[in-house]
Amino acid sequence: TTYNTLPYKFEAGTPAIAEAVGLGAAIDYLAGLERSAMEVAENALLQRANELVGSVPGMTVIGTAANKVPLMSFKIDGLHPSDIGTLLDQQGIAVRTGHLCAMPLMEFYELPGTARASFAFYNTLEEVEQLFTALQKIQRLFA
């Protein structure tokens, strides 16, 4: 066996060339966008989501700071967050579920976890409404 010199001996296998090229393309794309326009779009999505919370009986938003990134962590009474995620997935909607790398916070609120929708500038108001239509359907299914 022949060992290479530092730092090369710690780089086993083929470098992530395709990933590096993809990252470069993503950076170029984002650099061409106006950050303030992205922020306005994301805030509009979060605002619409906040308006629709009341349309889902038993839904509670976890984290309601006035100035926050466009994320919505939530729970629905009587439903486990993993079940919410699975049922949304079956309807073509992706959310994150579980402790979300915040176990001390979940323990503080005595929650088994939450579901979290993340909104980005490329999402649409229609997609936010689809999320809430799906949540209403899920809530009715288990009511």
Located regions from the model:
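Pyridoxal 5′-phosphate
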Residues: 1-143
